[in-house]
């Protein structure tokens, strides 16, 4: 394979992994431990 193809596959995989991890963190089981600053601030 050419170097450019390998770099494109690597960068695409990295971005997909970061996106998957952030969605899992936001909506997965760990999301119950996240604090919500809007709920903490009552007017």
UniProtKB/Swiss-Prot annotation:
Query: In the UniProt record, does the keyword Transmembrane occur?
Result: yes
Localization annotation: Plastid, Chloroplast thylakoid membrane
Q: Which Pfam families match?
A: PsbN
Q: Could you list this entry's UniProt keywords, alphabetically sorted.
A: Chloroplast, Membrane, Plastid, Thylakoid, Transmembrane, Transmembrane helix
According to the UniProt entry, the coiled-coil residues are none
Q: Which InterPro entries match?
A: PSII_PsbN
Q: What does this protein do?
A: May play a role in photosystem I and II biogenesis.
At the top level, the lineage of the source is: Eukaryota
User: Its principal location?
Assistant: plastid
The answer to whether UniProt assigns keyword Chloroplast to this entry is yes
- Topology class, membrane: Single-pass membrane protein
GO BP: any one term: photosynthesis
UniProt-recorded name of the protein = Protein PsbN
Q: Cite a GO CC annotation.
A: chloroplast thylakoid membrane
| TM helices/strands, residue ranges | 7-29
Say which species the protein is native to: Phaeodactylum tricornutum (strain CCAP 1055/1)
* Name of the gene this protein is made from: psbN
Which HAMAP family does this UniProt record tie to the protein?
PSII_PsbN
Which family, according to the similarity comment?
A: Belongs to the PsbN family.
